[in-house]
């Protein structure tokens, strides 16, 4: 199970990295130790995570500086653990996206271009494939990462960056083997490339890709949007759009109020002229948007069936979970501290930040272990949600963590929260992070959960030390 080793940093590190092929078992053991400390003190430096031990700190730095340690081997070890976990699930989503890692300190001059040549920030571009299980959309793990530095002169590039989509597909295929038939690749508009679509279809693989280019359907001769607009409406659905600050066409910032949007759904079978590719498409388009608002519109290309309303809604639901990889990027850069690292050599920095990519996945999974009931309810699995909520909090927390959390939450537990249950633990941690549930939704934000988790962990060492002293008969 995903949660079996998740909450104990040492167990988690062992499960993810103990199979790393680093050329010497002592290096692998050191990787496990370093990863465990970085996970225990997420977002903190090696110095802080070493807990005042000079030997631990020096050992960690020696590992990070070791030229015989391959960053790619570190990433592969984590990816193969993801493959192992994936065997539990009948269907998976492979969410793909690219992000940049930006640095301005001394090492920056040896890294690649991110913006203009004049920019002081330089770094890497990283394309990631993140696996989710397709029922409750829990994060399984990282399946693949490709890192590269963009040269100042595009003519110096080894190959087109668009090749990252085909490379990710090939690596996923190799690692997943026969399980690849259970995997649906989910990509944004950048993946709307003829070679990528053709490759997925040639290998009989599944995908949902948002359309970018004004392609035409061969049979109707119409552009895809116009062709789908001519198809009968399957039905509609509503979504809630949160409040957000936006920049208008004149560059002025304004507040976009929260609203509900009604969308219509149409679908059809299409054939693209280039390569004579035949696939399915779904068009979701907002009906009667407020004056001044750009209507929501998604045109999705897919291998999945789309004949019925339920099938089309499933494709939409799959694509809406693409945002999870954006949360991974946030967890990696901010929560795990990838962009706060200050190693002075590119290779050392890459080793460190590669470890932190899996620490970031753990942060996502920690949150999801508490929010699983909400995910189950969203899929209509009410009995399953109630069953999970009623489980003991010790299924995800240690007895000491439960005891400390109970002390910190004393007098705050609501009547509907069963003492010692997972539902209570979720709400108690959220309250510790400042969640007031003023809207009576019972659903805490990412930030509140993480703040609460950090607060619990920061107090745990003192709590354990006090217990130890009391066990020795020392009054405190």
Swiss-Prot record:
One of its GO terms (molecular function) is transposase activity. Changing residue 319 to A: Loss of strand transfer activity. Gene3D superfamilies: Tn5 transposase, domain 1 (1.10.246.40), Transferase Inhibitor Protein From Tn5, Chain (1.10.740.10), Transposase Inhibitor Protein From Tn5, Chain A, domain 1 (3.90.350.10). SUPFAM superfamilies: Ribonuclease H-like. Residues 369-476 are annotated as: Important for dimerization. Monomer. Homodimer of tnp (isoform 1), and heterodimer of tnp (isoform 1) and inh (isoform 2). This is Transposase for transposon Tn5. The gene is tnpA.
């Amino acid at each position: 199970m995903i949660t079996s080793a998740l909450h104990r940093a040492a167990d988690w590190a062992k499960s993810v990295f103990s199979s790393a092929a680093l050329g010497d078992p002592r290096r692998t053991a050191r990787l496990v130790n370093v990863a465990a400390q970085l996970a225990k003190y997420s977002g903190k430096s090696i110095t802080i995570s070493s807990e005042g031990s000079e030997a631990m700190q020096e050992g960690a730095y020696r590992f990070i500086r070791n030229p015989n340690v391959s960053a790619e081997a570190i990433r592969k070890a984590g990816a193969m653990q993801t493959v192992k976990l994936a065997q539990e699930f009948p269907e998976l989503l492979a969410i793909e996206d690219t992000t940049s890692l930006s640095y301005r300190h001394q090492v920056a001059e040896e890294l690649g271009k991110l913006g203009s040549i004049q920019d002081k920030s330089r770094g890497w571009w990283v394309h990631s494939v993140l696996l989710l299980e397709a029922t409750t959309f829990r994060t399984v793990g990282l399946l693949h990462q490709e890192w590269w530095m963009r040269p100042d002169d595009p003519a110096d590039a080894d190959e087109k960056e668009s090749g990252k989509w085909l490379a990710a597909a090939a690596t996923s295929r190799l690692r997943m083997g026969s399980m690849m038939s259970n995997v649906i690749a989910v990509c944004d508009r950048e993946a709307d490339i003829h070679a990528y679509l053709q490759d997925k279809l040639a290998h009989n693989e599944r995908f949902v890709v948002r359309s970018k280019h004004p392609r035409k359907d061969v049979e109707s001769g119409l552009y895809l949007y116009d062709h789908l607009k001519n198809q009968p409406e399957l039905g509609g659905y509503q979504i809630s759009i949160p409040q957000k600050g936006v920049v208008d066409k004149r560059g002025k910032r304004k507040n976009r109020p929260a609203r509900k949007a009604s969308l219509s759904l149409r679908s059809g079978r299409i054939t693209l002229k280039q390569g004579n590719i035949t696939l399915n498409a779904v068009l979701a388009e907002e009906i009667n948007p407020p004056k001044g608002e750009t209507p929501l519109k998604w045109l999705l290309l897919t291998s999945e069936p789309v004949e019925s309303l339920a099938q089309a809604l499933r494709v939409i639901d799959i694509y809406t979970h693409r945002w999870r990889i954006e949360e991974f990027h946030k967890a990696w850069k901010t929560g795990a501290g990838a962009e706060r690292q200050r190693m002075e050599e590119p290779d050392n920095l890459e080793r460190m930040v590669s470890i932190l990519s899996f620490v970031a996945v753990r942060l996502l999974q920690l949150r999801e272990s508490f929010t699983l009931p909400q995910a189950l309810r969203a899929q209509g699995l009410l009995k399953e949600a109630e069953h999970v909520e009623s489980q003991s909090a010790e299924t995800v927390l240690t007895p000491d963590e439960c005891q400390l959390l109970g002390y910190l939450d004393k007098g705050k537990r609501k009547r509907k929260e069963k003492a010692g249950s997972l539902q209570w633990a979720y709400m108690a941690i959220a309250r510790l992070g400042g969640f007031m549930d003023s809207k009576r939704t019972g659903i805490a934000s990412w930030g509140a959960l993480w703040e609460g988790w950090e607060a619990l962990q920061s107090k745990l060492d003192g709590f354990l030390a006090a217990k130890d002293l009391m066990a020795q008969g020392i009054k405190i």
